[in-house]
Curated annotation (Swiss-Prot):
Family named by the database record: Belongs to the TCP-1 chaperonin family.
Species of the source: Mus musculus
NCBIfam families referenced in this protein's UniProt entry, alphabetically: chap_CCT_alpha (TIGR02340), thermosome_alpha (NF041082), thermosome_beta (NF041083)
Matches recorded under InterPro entries: Chap_CCT_alpha, Chaperone_TCP-1, Chaperonin_TCP-1_CS, Cpn60/GroEL/TCP-1, GroEL-like_apical_dom_sf, GROEL-like_equatorial_sf, TCP-1-like_intermed_sf, TCP-1_chaperonin
Gene (name only): Tcp1
Protein name: T-complex protein 1 subunit alpha
GO cellular component: acrosomal vesicle; cell body; centrosome; chaperonin-containing T-complex; Golgi apparatus; heterochromatin; microtubule; microtubule organizing center
Length: 556
């Protein structure tokens, strides 16, 4: 009689694997927990080659961690997803997911089946989103530009630029409004990637500036070229204008030494003809990602055109999109002939080389197809400038979301406290097993105001109790429903009306983080078996099919 089927690996099942997963998730959440909120602390991460990153952006911290545990990887990917989808709320989504898992694990230990917990969580998430949309949203039309500035300031409050929040919030709002365009369906769009952020260390934060136009960190190819061109016609080339050399391996047999000179002459004429074709269309600004030989620069100087070499491909794409140009990787058409047409050119009102701060930059102003904006950041050192860039990215995304969806919710733990009270009452109305799961979901949400208070060195138990009392009153007593805007004031350590204080977050940040955290918790909760296969051993003679063939083990 044969023995049972053996699995070549380590297998853990049931409660052991669930506890393991919950512990892994909790340890990831504990890493980012202290960086949460307006008084959160920063993390210093050093990679294997010694590069240092100082940040308190949840997505960046988790991206730089090398995590082995599969359940912990789910949370790292969750933060990355929140960053890509919304741009802000990356730390809170991880903290909520870990807390949901911890409380679900407690229920499972009390012999409640994971399926009941999962269906309870799904129901609670659905109800929470409905409650936010019906009761907690504030329409931005009634608040105007102030609402955008306050949302940006709320996003920046936990970051390195929070101290100059007013200055940067106005800059961010102006930048997002500058890149606005209307798509084919008539919807306004705000492509945040069109805001070019350049960093130059030196000076203070407050000397950072917003520039109307797209800034390139390049200079003109030759001193003899004009530094300013009005009514620019821009050619975007993704190849170098250097002397054409024959490919490696090409052999030419020559009988007459004069032919060698002709070959060399032809090599230089090919590039000369390309340049003449480009200039013949009226192009007066040529941007290329490659190099331009000095001997060819004279043709541009003679034509009075501005040629810029070594432009970053990312920048070239943005310039092409903004000016309406086509990026060409070759001049050859389908027939193999080299042509360049006027339709391939982009247009801008002005291209100028200016000295801004301590650097020479090329500014492309008032492009034809779309408007663009650039922000130049100043800071004490590279670490600071990098962190400022991450902070601005979050703020830009927040302003974009507020403009697109035209609604915000109060910050400072107000939404979580309101949902916690509502879901607790909702749970008692449920007559099924889901009641316990919904109650745990409600309790899990309090981790947000709790963590905010702990990080601000306040008495979290006292503050959260007061906050819950206000929200309970708002939901029980219709006359006092304005208390639903009450959130935490972490500087003075007391509850306050966050609608009046101007602490706003985009609705989508809260809704998405709830949905993503619930889905991530459910994904990990469903796992009840973990099989880790052993790596194939090197000294196993018959480990692979090839080895078996060579050793003759397969011969009859």
């Amino acid at each position: 009689m044969e023995g049972p089927l053996s699995v070549f690996g380590d297998r853990s099942t049931g409660e052991a694997v669930r506890s393991q997963n919950v512990m892994a998730a909790a340890s990831i959440a504990n890493i980012v927990k202290s960086s949460f909120g307006p008084v959160g602390l920063d993390k210093m991460l050093v990679d294997d080659i010694g590069d240092v990153t100082i940040t308190n952006d949840g997505a960046t911290i988790l991206k730089l961690l090398e995590v082995e545990h599969p359940a912990a990887k789910v949370l790292c990917e969750l933060a990355d997803l929140q960053d890509k989808e919304v741009g802000d709320g990356t730390t809170s989504v991880v903290i909520i997911a870990a807390e949901l898992l911890k409380n679900a694990d407690e229920l499972v230990k009390q012999k409640i089946h994971p399926t009941s917990v999962i269906s309870g969580y799904r129901l609670a998430c659905k109800e929470a989103v409905r409650y936010i949309n019906e009761n907690l949203i504030i329409n931005t039309d009634e608040l105007g530009r102030d609402c955008l500035i306050n949302a940006a300031k709320t996003s920046m409050s936990s970051k390195i630029i929070g101290i100059n929040g007013d200055y940067f919030a106005n800059m961010v709002v102006d930048a997002v409004l500058a890149v606005k365009y209307t798509d084919a369906r008539g919807q306004p769009r705000y492509p945040v990637n069109s805001v070019n952020i350049l960093k130059a260390h030196g000076r203070s934060q407050i000397e950072s500036m917003l520039i109307n136009g797209y800034a390139l960190n390049c200079v003109v190819g030759s001193q003899g070229m004009p530094k300013r061109i009005v009514n620019a016609k821009i050619a975007c080339l993704d190849f170098s204008l250097q002397k054409t050399k024959m490919k490696l391996g090409v052999q030419v047999v020559i009988t007459d030494p004069e032919k060698l000179d002709q070959i060399r002459q032809r090599e230089s004429d090919i590039t000369k003809e390309r340049i003449q074709k480009i200039l013949a269309t009226g192009a007066n600004v040529i941007l290329t990602t490659g190099g331009i030989d000095d001997m060819y620069l004279k043709y541009f100087v003679e034509a009075g055109a501005m040629a810029v070499r070594r432009v970053l491909k990312r920048d070239l794409k943005h310039v092409a999109k903004a000016s309406g140009a086509s990026i060409l990787s070759t001049l050859a058409n389908l027939e193999g002939e080299e042509t360049f047409e006027v339709t391939m050119l982009g247009q801008a009102e002005e291209v100028v080389q200016e000295r801004i701060c301590d650097d020479e930059l090329i500014l492309i102003k008032n492009t034809k197809a779309r408007t663009s904006a650039s922000i130049i950041l100043r800071g004490a050192n590279d670490f600071m400038c990098d962190e400022m860039e991450r902070s601005l990215h979050d703020a830009l995304c927040v302003v974009k979301r507020v403009l697109e969806l035209k609604s915000v919710v109060p910050g400072g733990g107000a939404v979580e406290a309101a949902l916690s009270i509502y879901l607790e009452n909702y749970a008692t109305s449920m007559g099924s097993r889901e009641q316990l799961a919904i109650a745990e979901f409600a309790r899990s949400l309090l981790v947000i105001p709790n963590t905010l208070a702990v990080n601000a060195a306040q008495d979290s138990t006292d503050l959260v109790a007061k906050l819950r009392a206000f929200h309970n009153e708002a939901q029980v007593n219709p006359e006092r429903k304005n208390l639903k805007w009450i959130g935490l004031d972490l500087v003075h350590g007391k509850p306050r009306d966050n609608k009046q204080a101007g602490v706003f977050e985009p609705t989508i940040v809260k809704v998405k983080s709830l949905k993503f955290a619930t889905e991530a918790a459910i994904t990990i909760l469903r796992i009840d078996d973990l099989i880790k296969l052993h790596p194939e051993s090197k000294d196993d003679k018959h480990g692979s099919y090839e080895n078996a063939v060579h050793s003759g083990a397969l011969d009859d």
